[in-house]
Regions:
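Topology signature of small-to-medium multi-pass alpha-helical membrane proteins
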Residues: 1-144
Length: 144
């Protein structure tokens, strides 16, 4: 069960890494603006926004997604090097850190009509299954 939990959490890390990297690429290389703009506003509303508003949102998008990429890499290393070996501290670190991120992902998107709900649900489900399998294995003694 520990191996399965580690795999599911690694999938969480990989999806988070890929989505955040894609968004960073789009915004940093000026391929487009923050995807949040199109999720929340109509094209006519975006056209009427001041350029500084769009730049500010893009800046926050770059900041958020750069942290998300870094967190995903750190999570992957903790899973691979520590959790998969049954180290309890790794379980608690991942439980608190990823749990914090998942809770605030819902809180952050709530005022915007839960614009990212599809992604939030998938990532939260992977987190709950992965951390649940890992925790059960570590604390019930089934470290396979």
């Amino acid at each position: 069960m520990l191996k399965r939990g580690s795999i599911v959490l690694s999938i969480w890390s990989g999806i988070n890494f890929l989505i955040s990297s894609l968004i960073l690429t789009i915004v940093v290389f000026h391929i487009g603006n923050s995807p949040l703009l199109e999720m929340v506003f109509e094209k006519s509303e975006i056209a009427s926004l001041d350029a500084m508003v769009i730049t500010s949102l893009n800046t926050l998008t770059i900041l958020y997604n750069s942290y998300a990429v870094a967190l995903s890499v750190l999570v992957w290393f903790v899973i691979r090097l520590c959790l998969s070996k049954g180290q309890k501290w790794a379980f608690w670190v991942l439980l608190i850190t990823i749990g914090f991120v998942e809770i605030f992902a819902f809180i952050a998107s709530a005022p915007l009509g839960n614009a990212r709900w599809q992604v939030n649900i998938i990532l939260s489900a992977l987190y709950i299954v992965g951390i649940g399998l890992s925790g059960y294995s570590i604390f019930k003694g089934d470290k396979k």
